[in-house]
């Protein structure tokens, strides 16, 4: 459908249809249901299907498997698998559908435009660098950046777990995340299973977030069709069946931050007439890049971008992106909107954009996300011990 539309119609269709659905059922509305259930006033609307199953439950486990979106679950698990048998509801990831934006949105019950956690790497003007938010590393050079917590200091967040604890001291609310996200986190799926069981044992009231970075890691490396991916998704299915059986007093949700697709790469530097119009390095994501353009060159940039990449990418101006709330709704600040360049592009097929002249080292992943396909955006929530 997209290929036969001109660039203006592509953008209008995306805003009118895709983003309308995104802003109604997503990770943010899901986590606002968790807030509401534990007595905290929600920031946004809640997810009705989730509200229903939460009723009466004092112990809630929120288990996120990175990258295991709807397309991955339905590709690798049979209809009678434990996870699919317990399917509850389909929601959208954040835009862009990437871990730093999506997990932060879920953990704060706020949209990326509110938190400022919008992508994998963002340009911090104070430091003149693209910084990977989770790692405090220069995206282009790989160097560790000082001071130690630039993202946390510049765009600090407060999680739903903190809010729940503040509201009710009797509720145990915390996270368990795979090493090295947590220094003492589990390193394998087997350890992850043991940690879930150990954590839940003996608790009366709790809201606990469990995070594991598979199958995202494997799909980046091998693509979404690889046997290794199939094996690990089916292993996850068995683990969930066991922990739910072992903890019948706990309401479990399994879900993802985004899906995954197999990808191809295009080098932005191949078109010097276009690349030379940039004032700063490309930022955000390879499937949803943002561009800071030299003064007075915006019109030329748009024309050339659509000429070379209009078949594969939607292009929006910063003003259009903010007006159409592609990064979500809610209060924002100049600190946050300054991360957005003059233009934002987003992939509508398998292509990624990178700039070879800007990268000291570059990995050509076989699988990726953060673009604008249904496969990347849709997430199935499953619920157990309802």
Model-derived segments and their meaning:
Residues 2-4, 8-386:
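Feature captures the catalytic ectodomains and active-site-proximal regions of enzymes
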């Amino acid at each position: 459908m997209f290929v036969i539309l001109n660039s203006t119609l592509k953008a209008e269709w995306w805003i009118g249809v895709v983003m309308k659905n995104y802003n109604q059922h997503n990770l943010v509305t899901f986590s606002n249901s968790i807030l509401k259930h534990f007595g905290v006033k929600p920031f946004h609307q809640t997810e009705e299907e989730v509200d229903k199953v939460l009723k009466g439950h004092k112990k809630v486990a929120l288990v996120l498997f990175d990258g295991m979106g709807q397309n991955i679950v339905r590709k690798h698990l049979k209809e009678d698998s434990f996870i699919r048998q317990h399917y509850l509801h389909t929601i959208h990831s954040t835009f862009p559908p990437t871990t730093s934006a999506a997990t932060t949105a879920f953990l704060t019950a706020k949209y990326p435009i509110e938190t400022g956690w919008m992508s994998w790497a963002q340009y911090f003007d104070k430091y003149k660098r693209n910084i990977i938010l989770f790692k405090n590393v220069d995206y282009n050079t790989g160097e560790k950046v000082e001071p130690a917590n630039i993202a946390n200091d510049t765009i600090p967040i407060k999680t739903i777990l903190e809010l729940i604890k503040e509201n009710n001291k009797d509720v145990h609310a915390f996270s368990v995340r795979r090493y090295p996200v947590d220094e003492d986190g589990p390193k394998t799926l087997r350890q992850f299973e043991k940690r879930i069981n150990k954590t839940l044992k003996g608790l009366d009231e709790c809201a606990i977030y469990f995070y594991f970075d598979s199958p995202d890691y494997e799909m980046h490396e091998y693509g979404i069709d690889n046997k290794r991916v199939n094996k690990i998704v089916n292993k996850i299915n068995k683990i969930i069946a066991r922990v739910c059986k072992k903890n019948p007093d706990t309401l479990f949700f399994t879900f993802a931050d985004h899906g995954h697709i197999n990808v191809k790469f295009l080098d932005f530097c191949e078109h010097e007439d276009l690349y030379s119009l940039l004032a700063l390095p490309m930022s955000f994501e390879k499937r949803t890049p943002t561009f800071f353009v030299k003064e007075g060159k915006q019109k030329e940039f748009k024309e050339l971008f659509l000429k070379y990449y209009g078949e594969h990418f939607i292009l929006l101006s910063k003003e259009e992106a903010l007006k159409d709330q592609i990064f979500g709704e809610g209060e924002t600040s100049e600190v946050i909107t300054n991360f957005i360049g003059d233009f934002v592009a987003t992939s509508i097929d398998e292509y990624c954009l990178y700039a070879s002249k800007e990268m000291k080292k570059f990995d050509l992943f076989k699988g990726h996300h953060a673009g604008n396909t249904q496969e990347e955006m849709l997430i199935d929530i499953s619920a157990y011990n309802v």
